[in-house]
Amino acid sequence: MAKKTAVVDLGSNSIRMVIFEKTSRYGFYTTCEYKRKVRLGENAYNNGKILQEEAMQRAEDALAFFKQCTLKHKCKKIFIVGTSALRDAPNSKNFIKRIKDNLSLNIRCIDGKSESYLGGLAALNLLSPFKDGTTLDIGGGSSELCLIKNNRIISCISLDIGTVRLKELFYDTGKMDSLEEFIKPILEQIPKEFCNQNLIAIGGSLRAISNSIMQKNSYPLKNLHDFRYMLDEEKGHILKIFNSNLDSLINFGIKKDRFDTIKEGIFIFLKIAEKIKAKQVITSGVGIREGVYLQDLLRPKITFPPNFNPSLKCLQDKFLQSKQKNKTPHFALQIFTTLKNLHKLNDNY
């Protein structure tokens, strides 16, 4: 497998790239991350789902920049996956060919179930151990759910409700009265088996909600990954965000680039959380990009070996190599010599 691998998630709202560096058979770490808010799905949902020229050009420009970044970092592999906006578009093949011709980059357009599976794969392997849970990844064009039971991926579904889709079809057109009627049959597509106390939150909208809760509660850590909260305890705060005006969102710790879709994200989140009877929300800092990488790293398996921690393995690979191990007695003696007078230790020790 390549030493450095880039994974690009070509979403309806944003294009994100992560560069991973492999340290050993299963050891790896994130070198850097890039994000461009290109809105590939902009004005597509009220125009027959056809990708618009301005949006395609923004996406092409972002991919050209990402390609330069991969060359700078000397990546040997580049995976680019297209999700909802691309798979829904009648002109998706034209866009994929355009990127191939202009940038020599290959885009793999994945279906909704594959997108759901990749998010579930990342959560299963990279969150603190959990036995059962249902992942929810709210994107710009769709929302994916993955059922995990007894540390196994059981089932995956994709729903045609996303933040950009709802924004263009209902919020921007003032047709809010029709929203409940629109979403009700979509929620009915969620099987009863997906009901779970643990909802694993994936995606920018859900991370923004978790970040706001962390700030409100003066949570001591800045790391969102694996942050957990009880939905009943925080629902009031979430509704305050939902009911606030745009100018007030910054007071809740919501970033400006999230202002125009956070309410749609909250609406989808609360409806699905209620449908699956979720009680605890587990925030995932990983998603489809990590899932794509793990699929390549772990194959033909889907999980790490028993009792294996990829983070610890990475630290071991980076800082405890054989040459450094040989210096341990040397450093130990230096520490002893420096502190022996303070602790009144005899040289014989």
Q: Where are the language model's segments positioned?
A:
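Helical "lid/coupling" subdomains associated with nucleotide-phosphate turnover
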Residues: 19, 43-72, 85-95, 103-125, ...
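Post-signal peptide N-terminal segment of secreted/secretory-pathway proteins
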Residues: 76-78
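N-terminal basic/disordered segments at the start of proteins
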Residues: 3-30
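Conserved ATP-binding subdomain of kinase catalytic cores across diverse folds
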Residues: 25-42, 71
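Ser/Thr-glycine-rich phosphate-binding loops at phosphate-binding pockets of nucleotides
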Residues: 12-14, 139-145, 204
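Short glycine-aspartate micro-motif
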Residues: 5-9, 133-137, 199
